[in-house]
């Protein structure tokens, strides 16, 4: 192990393959090597090299995020936002001309159009991000990422097998948690399940984009990358703690055959983008649609079901004020912030739609400062995933009590991290 830099099982596998190659080279007069394999070997010298693999991977991710959040995705999102605003104004004028009841008009314009529309504008960003990720997957590069990350993951108690569910976690936590079933070791599988929610899912992109556009417009990509890296860093710390305490032991061996590099299939990329867009639209017009209506109702009526002129007198404000003091050390003790985080438990996109409904057209900086916005972003990054992901964790662990404990732990980690960020920015 000391000589090869590999663990015992990997070293044995390497010796077997070396022996097989020596036998083949001595027996076969002329071994034909395909052009694709020769090209892949040359590319792997750079992409999986000992000193170049990690810098290249970080460079590729940096370029992907820059193109998504600062160039292509953001511009498309801005254009769509103009269209959504124009459509909302058109609906408003039409309902006013028709003389519809003001309460119903408020539901349609201030509730549904503002809430669902505020989430829809982030569809281009999500599609752009998955366009680049699907290309990386289809070329065979992501398989190299699993191979490259095996050694670093072993230092925190996991193997390269865990990287696949974690990478899926950047899309959605539900299939990522289900993908841990491919991890043979029960110890590794449970550790991976607990770490996967720290990989920021695509549903949170709308929150990040919403806040970075308002508070950090000139550093969008940098803030986005920082959030993703912070989630990974917290996951590493959590893995080290679990490896030293709850999940003592060694990770399972990891051996895989790397496929040749190939040009991405336009059909497979298009199918993946269609699936992501369809899933996003289904959530926008089902879960988020219903959540928006519920939020509008709670912020429009008081406890006696009378229409309120000021949402501060509403049912929603009453609920939010019970919880808001918990977030005072984080810089956002406003009841509207608390209720948006509660709605985020249903679906993370609901955080944006809830804030949009509660703001009533007012700018976001009336509720947040740059400092509290950064703290809020860190909290949304780390606190418990959506209810669908929690239900999946419950099914995989087979215990409601353990699931409740996991949710509370995630909320505590998020609260501590956000309070530290808020305090550090205050000092700086």
Where are these regions (language model features)?
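Alpha-helical transmembrane helix bundles of large polytopic membrane transport and channel proteins
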Residues: 1-32
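Short, membrane-interfacial amphipathic segments enriched in basic
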Residues: 9, 27-40, 84, 94-105, ...
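Juxtamembrane inter-helical linkers in multi-pass membrane proteins
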Residues: 32, 82, 86-90, 143-173, ...
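Core alpha-helical transmembrane segments of integral membrane proteins
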Residues: 47-147
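Hydrophobic core segments of alpha-helical transmembrane domains in multi-pass membrane transport
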Residues: 56-67, 129-134, 212-214, 227-242, ...
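Extended, low-charge hydrophobic alpha-helical regions
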Residues: 71-112, 156, 177-189, 293-411
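Hydrophobic alpha-helical transmembrane segments of multi-pass integral membrane proteins
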Residues: 116-142, 149-175, 322-359
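Transmembrane helix-loop junctions at the membrane interface of multipass transporters and ion channels
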Residues: 202-225, 388-399, 418-428
């Amino acid at each position: 192990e000391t000589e090869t830099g590999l663990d015992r099982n990997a070293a044995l596998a390497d010796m077997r393959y070396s022996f097989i190659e020596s036998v083949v080279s001595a027996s076969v007069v002329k071994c034909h090597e395909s052009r694709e394999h020769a090209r892949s070997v040359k590319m792997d010298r750079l992409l999986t090299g000992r000193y170049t693999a990690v810098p290249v991977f970080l460079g590729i991710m940096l370029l992907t995020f820059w193109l998504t959040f600062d160039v292509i995705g953001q511009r498309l999102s801005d254009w769509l936002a103009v269209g959504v605003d124009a459509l909302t104004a058109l609906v408003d004028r039409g309902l006013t001309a028709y003389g519809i009841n003001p309460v119903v008009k408020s539901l349609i314009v201030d509730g549904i159009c503002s809430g669902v529309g505020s989430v829809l504008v982030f569809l281009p960003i999500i599609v752009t991000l998955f366009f680049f990720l699907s290309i990386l997957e289809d070329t065979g590069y992501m398989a190299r990422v699993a191979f490259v990350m095996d050694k670093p993951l072993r230092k925190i108690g996991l193997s390269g097998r865990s990287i696949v569910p974690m990478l899926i976690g950047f899309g959605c936590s539900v299939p990522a948690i289900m993908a841990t079933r491919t991890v043979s070791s029960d110890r590794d599988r449970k550790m991976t399940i607990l770490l996967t929610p720290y990989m920021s899912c695509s549903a949170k992109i709308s929150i990040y984009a919403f806040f970075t556009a308002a508070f950090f417009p000139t550093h969008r990509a940098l803030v986005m990358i920082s959030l993703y890296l912070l989630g990974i860093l917290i996951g590493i710390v959590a893995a080290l703690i679990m490896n030293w305490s709850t999940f003592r032991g060694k990770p399972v061996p990891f051996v895989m055959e790397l496929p040749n590099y190939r040009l991405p299939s336009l059909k497979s990329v298009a199918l993946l983008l269609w699936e992501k867009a369809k899933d996003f639209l289904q959530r926008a017009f089902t879960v988020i649609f219903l959540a928006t209506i519920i939020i509008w109702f709670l912020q429009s009526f008081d406890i006696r079901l009378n229409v309120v002129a000021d949402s501060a007198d509403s049912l929603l404000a009453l609920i939010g004020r019970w919880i808001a003091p918990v977030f005072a050390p984080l810089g956002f003790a406003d009841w509207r912030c608390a209720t948006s985080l509660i709605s985020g438990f249903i679906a993370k996109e609901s955080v944006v739609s809830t804030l949009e409904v509660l703001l009533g057209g007012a700018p976001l900086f009336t509720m947040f400062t740059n400092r509290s916005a950064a703290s809020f972003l860190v909290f949304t990054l780390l606190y418990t995933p959506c209810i669908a992901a929690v239900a999946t964790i419950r099914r995989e662990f087979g215990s409601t009590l353990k699931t409740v404990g996991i949710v509370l732990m995630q909320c505590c980690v998020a609260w501590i991290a956000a309070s530290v960020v808020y305090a550090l920015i205050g000092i700086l």
